[in-house]
From Swiss-Prot:
Superkingdom of origin: Bacteria
Gene: waaF
Gene Ontology cellular-component terms listed: cytosol
Organism listed in the record: Salmonella typhimurium (strain LT2 / SGSC1412 / ATCC 700720)
Annotated Pfam families: Glyco_transf_9
Protein name as catalogued: Lipopolysaccharide heptosyltransferase 2
Keyword Transferase in record: yes
Enzyme class: transferase
Pathway(s) per entry: Bacterial outer membrane biogenesis; LPS core biosynthesis
Family the entry assigns: Belongs to the glycosyltransferase 9 family.
Length: 348
């Protein structure tokens, strides 16, 4: 069976979608699974053994461009896919499998996709509270799984593999000392500072970890580089020697390998959190207005700290310097205690 998956467009969602690929491969061992997704996803997809080919999606996240989608679909006809799974809920994401004449097209109904999907499922959000459960449910025939409790357990969580040789080579390429173990920070998050633990808390945690004999590495995109510099600026010159701001300095492939080399990760609710979880790194995940009830880190080595419940829209007055009060209230000492507990369990 040849399968085409139209994959998500965000790092975290792409990582969670691996649970679907793993489940499909477990159910259909001979299946060949190709995933169409933005080109930046290739470093993630290339480390998923279930995925045969990563097909770059040349269209932007918001672009309809129906003519180009028709052309893309027609170009895929020669591959003769038997089935398609469409993971985004948008109307446009279902067009390419339709134009590719793939006979069986599965996905949640989403934006009125009658006809485009001929196996459209109606989502009961209460029955499927976790995004990963919604992905995995699509691997089963319609009506077989009526709620998350019906899914075979344990779920096949995302897993990325990185070799020891890759880690040592990448650390050398970035001139990271082998004298001290690495702790990674992921201080960025999409949609601005409201989902971020304050930089001054990260700085205080970095000081304590450096004084304990660790070195700290900051990961993220170019948008997070300034936040990384704010963390660095709060350290004295001796401490700065053991803290590297690599936000915006690495490609995604390099960041994956370096995160794998870390003894532990401290992270906001972000895509890199899901990467760290898939790499089986001990991690402390810090949540504020966004909720771990929908997209938690999928790892037995993850500790979630959140001081509020439910989902909160951010309003003016809720934040200081853009930070949400519930994240301001998470103390560096609390995070350090969780880190120490995780590291002791790992024998570090």
């Amino acid at each position: 069976m040849k399968i085409l998956v139209i994959g998500p467009s965000w790092v975290g969602d792409m990582m969670m979608s691996q649970s679907l690929y793993r489940t499909l491969k477990a159910r259909y061992p001979q299946a060949i699974i190709d995933v169409m997704a933005p080109a930046w996803c290739r470093p993630l997809l290339s480390r998923m053994p279930e995925v045969n080919e990563a097909i770059p999606m040349p269209l932007g996240h918001g672009a309809l461009e129906i003519g180009e989608r028709r052309r893309l679909g027609h170009s895929l006809r020669e591959k003769r896919y038997d089935r398609a799974w469409v993971l985004p809920n948008s109307f446009k994401s279902a067009l390419i499998p339709f134009f590719a004449n793939i006979p069986h097209r599965t996905g949640w109904r989403g934006e009125m996709r009658y006809g485009l999907l001929n196996d459209a499922r109606v989502l009961d959000k209460d029955a499927w509270p976790l995004m990963v459960e919604r992905y995995v449910a699509l691997a089963y025939d319609k009506g077989v799984m009526r709620a998350a409790k019906d899914l075979p357990q344990p779920l096949l969580w995302p897993q990325l593999q990185v070799s020891e040789g890759e880690k040592s080579l990448m650390c050398s390429d970035f001139s990271l000392s082998s004298e001290r173990p690495l702790i990674g920070f992921c201080p960025g998050a999409e949609f601005g500072p409201a989902k971020r633990w304050p930089h001054y808390h990260y700085a205080e945690l970095a000081k304590q970890l450096i004084n304990e004999g660790y070195q700290v590495v900051l990961f993220g995109s170019a948008k997070d580089h300034e936040a990384g510099n704010e963390i660095l600026a709060a350290l004295n010159s001796e401490q700065q020697a053991w803290c590297r701001n690599l936000a915006g300095e690495t490609q995604l492939e390099q960041a994956v390998i370096l995160i794998a080399a870390c003894k532990a990760i401290v992270t906001n609710d972000s895509g890199l959190m899901h990467v760290a979880a898939a790499l089986d790194r001990p991690l402390v995940a810090l949540y504020g207005p966004s909720s771990p009830d929908f997209t938690p880190p999928l790892s037995h080595k993850a500790r979630v700290i959140r001081l509020i419940t439910g989902y909160h829209k951010v309003r003016k007055g809720d934040t200081a310097q853009g930070y949400h009060q519930s994240l301001i209230d998470i103390t560096p000492q609390r995070v350090l205690e969780e880190l120490h507990s995780l590291l002791s369990e790992e024998g570090v």
